[in-house]
Amino acid sequence: MSNSLISDRKINCSRQAELELLKAYPILFMIIIHVYENLSVGRIDPTPRTYLEHVLQFLAGPATAPAYMFAMGVGIIYSGNNAPKLLFRRGLRLFLGGYALNAARSGILTALGTALTGRFDPELTKYLFLNMDILHFAGLALMMSSLLFGIKIKPLTIVGVSLILQLIGRRLAMLPEMTSDFSYIAGHFYKCSPAGCFPLMQWYIYPAFGILFGTVLQRVSDLKAWYRQLGL
């Protein structure tokens, strides 16, 4: 890649339309897949059974979560509120908002189910309320980034940190699966139970690369030429 395309000063500081689309697409498909899984008449198997399910699972899975997290990393750089303290507060609000969402989408249905059937499943209720999803991860990722920014870690080093975290997380995930309540806490950081979908150690690599990409993108003098060199 030609260094002539990279300036030593920031040029592209306004939000980029292509990256806004990159954020919008995952949100759309995450909404679609969650509505489909929760409101489908048929039983949803882990393995897709139909062509439609294959398409939905791919577009809302491997092609969505990493793209959203990468775009989030770019957004951190382009945000006017990325000072460490502000970033940490935003992350904390998102993290707590994840549990508020759990309560909102599960609490009413759990209460109705208990009232109608007279049966109460404490383990299922605990899972529904404490399950970690992408909103919790986003909050943790922002708080993690705020700590790294606070100690003046450079973007390339942040990527290195994320690689180390992923290696550690993968090793920890090889330990026997937890069944205790502690798994709901540990699951925020590495995959140790079904309750944690996006543990920080194994997924932070995507926003980390987004942070690096956004830092470079702000200094690109010719975006079209640069994207061409990237094969995009």
Model regions: which residues?
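Alpha-helical transmembrane segments and their immediate juxtamembrane cytosolic regions
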Residues: M1-L232
